[in-house]
Amino acid sequence: MEEQKIQEKSLAHGAAPPLTAVERFLNGQKNEALCFKKQERSIDRPIVKTTRAIEIRNENKENMMFGPRKEKNLAVIGEIVVKGAAKDYTCKDITKKQPYKNIIKGQWTADEDRKLIKLVMQHGERKWAVISEKLEGRAGKQCRERWHNHLRPDIKKDSWSEEEERLLVEAHTRIGNKWAEIAKLIQGRTENSIKNHWNATKRRQNSKRKHKRSKNADSNSDIDDLSPSAKRPRILEDYIKNIENNDKNNGENIMTTSGNNVLSTSNYDQFNSEDSTSSLLDDPYDEELVFLKNIFENHSLENINLSQGTEITQSSSSGFMIENPKPKPNLYNNTFGTHLGAMVTEPANSSHLASDIYLSDLLNGTASSSSSLTFLSSNNNEHAGENELLLPQANSTSERREMDLIEMLSGSTQGSNIWFPLF
């Protein structure tokens, strides 16, 4: 009985009987499949969020404006099974920056100034995050600006001297309104003090212009000598005045130049419009008409010495040649006399257009000042082959008669030997 109990205990608590090769192979395949399934389940398991809150303070990455950063509500990600052991992995993501809730944005008190001076003496002028931690209600940026603009021991708070204003003017001509760069060139003057001095001088100058005194020059001089403004340097004030005057002059020049340009363009447009209208009215329709008009107006027989029997030839760019042969006196009636071949200029106030030059005499009537010439050929045997220039009979300047169509046709058929250009 005892031996059976011992064997049962050995079977229950002892090693299992040895396995055959087939059983070992099958058991190995099952174990590998089970391990692979467990790993997949552990990876696909959803993230388990816990209610545990972890606060982490990182002193190396401090926010200068909002103080040290606090990280809260970090959740634990689910467990991953690795080789039968469970390990916890915490989230390494950083939460959003949370500013201080109790930051004071008002003026600094004397107690805060004393504390800030002590902390700067202890930690130096660069560790503003550490100083802001020990100074409640103030951020690192506030401490830095308060120190550099107000509490620094080498700051000058007295009135500006002529030398300082001269340096300010020279720097402003080169740099402009870059007050931080100018503060580096003027020792003892901060950025705020330079900007405030500039704006105060500008306001003072504008107020003097608006409120002029109505007293005499002597009384004004006495008051100015007693006033503190008499001791104030005027270098910066004169410089600002020159800048404003230059700006005004530039604006006036721009206005005048723009006005002149407008006037000149308007005059130019008017001139062009007049030229265009005159060219439309005076532009002839044919070059031959202009050529004939110039000959009949500008050249008379007396000027070209036709009475002496010289032969004159006129030519033009259009190819017309006119020959004036030696005239023979007393060929016709004595009414012509020495006026044979004389050409009369066109009247100034003719109502015909430029295209009616050839028919101007017919349209305006025959007068002593008519410009049209009648070309006739004599069928007489004595003067065969000779072309003579004849004028119409002279009438009084006040008389004008109308010519009907028959007279026009009969006058044109008489000069059959003379050809006219086709228009």
Swiss-Prot record:
InterPro entries: Homeodomain-like_sf, Myb_dom, MYB_TF, SANT/Myb, SANT_dom. One of its GO terms (biological process) is regulation of cell division. It comes from the Eukaryota. Residues 200-214 have a biased composition (Basic residues). Residues 128-151, 179-202 bind DNA. Its main location: nucleus. This is Transcription factor MYB64. It comes from Arabidopsis thaliana (Mouse-ear cress).
